[in-house]
């Protein structure tokens, strides 16, 4: 099969995987509505998802707070896919309209992240650098869930993890904490022995097809 043929088949498979039943107005978490393959969801997040940790100082309490977010944006025409993904994740999180004809799916409640989001990616691991972001994100989530971030030691652990997550620490955080006190931990390494599932390939529309041919 030619490269163009492979691309066409994967695009057809991708559409077949998520263009099933659609929840257009309400979220129905009935098991029979789960139409997405879990590897497809992982592949989709590898291509378009993000794991974020925000550390912000509260003006009222005068202390630092930590919030987490699992999210991704799509064009509004793909809103039905976001709704299916929300159903797949047991209805947690929310879908909001953004600017430039974008819609965004977010999960920010720590209990939902711990009990719904993290278990999925433990069972169906990410294959790109998103895997490293996920491991760091998970470690921060566990600190927050156990309220360890409320202590100075726990907050320093969060900052050390965040320093290696995505773009690292903001200028404000670097100026607010002594440089010697925050040491970025080494980013977890992505396994080079992972077996690529065809459903992952169909889901990872943002990941280039060259992984098939190198």
Where are these regions (language model features)?
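Sequence-level preference for short, compositionally simple segments enriched
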Residues: 1-214
């Amino acid at each position: 099969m030619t490269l163009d043929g492979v691309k066409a088949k994967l695009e057809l498979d991708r559409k077949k995987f998520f263009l099933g039943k659609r929840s257009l107005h309400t979220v129905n978490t009935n098991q029979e509505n789960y139409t997405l393959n879990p590897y497809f969801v992982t592949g989709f997040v590898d291509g378009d998802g993000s794991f974020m940790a925000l550390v912000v100082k509260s003006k009222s309490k005068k202390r630092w707070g930590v919030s987490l977010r699992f999210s991704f944006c799509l064009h509004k025409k793909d809103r039905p896919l976001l709704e299916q993904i929300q159903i797949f994740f047991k209805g947690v999180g929310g879908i909001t309209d953004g600017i430039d004809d974008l819609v965004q799916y977010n999960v920010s409640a720590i209990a939902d992240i711990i009990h719904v989001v993290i278990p999925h990616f433990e069972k169906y691991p990410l294959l790109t650098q998103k895997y490293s972001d996920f491991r760091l994100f998970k470690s921060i989530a566990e600190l927050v869930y156990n309220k360890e971030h409320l202590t100075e030691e726990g907050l320093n652990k969060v900052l050390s993890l965040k320093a290696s997550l995505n773009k690292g620490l903001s200028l404000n955080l670097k100026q607010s904490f002594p440089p010697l006190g925050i040491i970025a931990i080494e980013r977890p390494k992505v396994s080079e022995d992972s077996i690529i599932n065809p459903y992952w390939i169909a889901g990872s529309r943002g990941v280039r097809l060259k992984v098939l041919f190198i």
